[in-house]
A protein has these predicted regions:
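Glycine- and aromatic-enriched membrane alpha-helices
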Residues: 1-404
Length: 404
C-alpha cells in the first residue's frame, strides 16, 4: 500500500543524491590543475543531462523490467511507458516512478566518477561518447544483475546502495581507461597539487550530505532500516577521516585537509554496500580500515605499476568498493535486513562471503571488458586524447574556450 510519508522521504532522498554530482564536480575540480578545472567539472555536470535522458528513455527499463539471461532487462518501460503512480514491483509503499527517479540519480553520478581517472588529457567528445556507450554496456547490466533480479541477486550477493554497481564498476573502468589513454605529459617530473582546496572541502561536504540520501534512501522507506543505514554511513565516514588524519601525521607530521577529505569519501564508499546490512559496531571497523587499505593502494601500488589515475578514481572508489563488498560478506546480519540470505563470515556462515567475492570478480570482469569495448567503438569516431599543445595550454581553453 502506498505510503505518503515514504513517498515524501524518497523524493527528498533522490534530491540529496542528485546534489552529489555537483558535489563531485567541486571535489574533482578542486583537485585538478587550474588550467583544467572547468573541463574536470564539466565531465560531471554534462552527465546530469545525458544520463537523465538515457535513463528515462531506456535505462530504467533495461535495468529493472523483465530479465534476459540474468544480465539485462527489456524495453517494456521504454520512455517510462507504464511507469506511473501505482506501487512498483520493487516496493509496495512507493510508486514505480518514485523508485525509477531515485535510481536515476545513481545512474547520473556513476559515470562521473570515472572521469577523475583521465582528468587533464581526454577529449571531451571522446569521454561523452564513452559514457553514452558505457551506460549500456556496463551500468545497466550491472544494475540489473544486482538490483533488478539478475544473476548476482540470484546467487545471493547483496549490495545495499552500490558498492558493485556504482563504485567498483566506475573505479575499475577508470583504471582501464587511464591505462589505455596514457599518462599526463611530464607527470613523472613534477608533482601536481590541488589548485583549490576549499573547493575540495565544499565538494566533500556536498557528497557527505548527499550520501545520507544515497544510503538511507536505499531502504526505500522512512523506517528503522533507513535510520540504521544513516548511522552506519556517518560512522564509517567519520572513522575513515580520522584514520587518514592519523596516517598523515605518522607519515608527514601534519594532518592535511585533502587527506581528511579523502578519508571521508572512502569511508562513505566502503560502507555503501553494507550500510543496511552490517551492525553499527562493524561500521567503525569498515571505516577505520579502509583508509590504510586505500592509502597503500595510492602510495605503493599506483607508483609501482605506473598508471596515472589522475584524481584517484580507482584508488578511492575501486579499492574502497572492493573492501566494502568484502566487509559486507564478513559482517552482514540477516537480523538487520532479511534481504541477506545468510549471516556474514564472522558469524560462522561462509555462503554470503563467497557470494560477495564472486560478485566483486564479476563486476571487475564486466567493467574491464565493457570499457575495452566502449573504447574500441569510440576510437572509430575520434581520438581519445587531446594533442600535446592542448594539454599544455589546458583543457579549459582548448576544449571549452573558457577560463575559470
Amino acid at each position: 500500500m502506498l505510503n505518503s510519508g515514504d513517498i515524501g522521504f524518497m523524493i527528498i532522498a533522490a534530491t540529496y543524491v542528485f546534489l552529489m554530482t555537483p558535489g563531485l564536480a567541486f571535489f574533482y575540480g578542486g583537485l585538478a590543475q587550474r588550467k583544467n578545472v572547468l573541463n574536470t567539472m564539466m565531465m560531471s555536470v554534462a552527465f546530469m543531462g545525458l544520463s537523465s535522458v538515457l535513463w528515462v528513455l531506456c535505462g530504467y527499463s533495461l535495468s529493472f523490467s523483465g530479465d534476459l539471461g540474468g544480465v539485462i532487462g527489456n524495453l517494456k518501460w521504454f520512455a517510462f511507458n507504464g511507469v506511473g503512480a501505482e506501487a512498483g514491483p520493487y516496493s509496495d509503499n512507493i510508486p514505480n516512478m518514485g523508485f525509477a527517479l531515485f535510481q536515476m540519480m545513481f545512474a547520473i553520478i556513476t559515470p562521473s566518477l570515472i572521469t577523475g581517472a583521465v582528468a587533464g588529457r581526454m577529449k571531451f567528445k571522446a569521454i561523452f561518447l564513452f559514457v553514452f556507450l558505457w551506460q549500456f554496456v556496463v551500468y545497466y547490466p550491472m544494475a540489473h544483475m544486482v538490483w533488478g533480479g539478475g544473476f548476482l541477486a540470484q546467487i545471493g550477493s547483496i549490495d545495499f546502495a552500490g558498492g558493485n554497481v556504482v563504485h567498483i564498476s566506475s573505479g575499475v573502468s577508470g583504471l582501464v581507461l587511464a591505462i589505455l589513454i596514457g599518462k599526463r605529459k611530464g607527470i613523472e617530473k613534477r608533482s601536481v597539487v590541488p589548485h583549490n582546496i576549499p573547493f575540495v572541502v565544499l565538494g566533500v561536504s556536498l557528497l557527505w550530505f548527499g550520501w545520507f540520501g544515497f544510503n538511507a534512501g536505499s531502504a526505500l522507506a522512512a523506517d528503522g532500516l533507513a535510520l540504521h543505514a544513516f548511522t552506519t554511513t556517518n560512522t564509517s565516514a567519520a572513522c575513515a577521516m580520522l584514520s587518514w588524519m592519523i596516517i598523515d601525521i605518522i607519515k608527514g607530521g601534519k594532518p592535511t585537509v585533502v587527506g581528511a577529505c579523502t578519508g571521508g569519501v572512502i569511508g562513505l564508499v566502503a560502507i555503501t554496500p553494507g550500510a543496511g546490512f552490517v551492525p553499527i559496531w562493524a561500521s567503525f571497523i569498515i571505516g577505520t580500515l579502509v583508509s590504510p587499505i586505500c592509502y597503500f593502494a595510492l602510495s605503493v601500488l599506483k607508483p609501482k605499476f605506473g598508471y596515472d589515475d589522475a584524481l584517484d578514481a580507482f584508488g578511492c572508489h575501486g579499492i574502497g568498493g572492493i573492501w566494502g563488498g568484502i566487509a559486507t560478506g564478513l559482517f552482514a546480519q540477516t537480523s538487520i535486513n532479511p534481504v541477506a540470505k545468510w549471516d556474514g563470515l564472522v558469524f560462522g556462515d561462509y555462503h554470503l562471503f563467497v557470494a560477495q567475492v564472486l560478485s566483486i570478480l564479476v563486476t571487475i570482469a564486466v567493467a574491464v571488458v565493457g570499457t575495452l569495448i566502449c573504447v574500441g567503438i569510440v576510437r572509430l569516431f575520434t581520438k581519445l586524447r587531446v594533442d600535446e599543445n592542448s594539454e599544455n595550454v589546458g583543457l579549459d581553453d582548448s576544449e571549452h574556450g573558457e577560463c575559470a
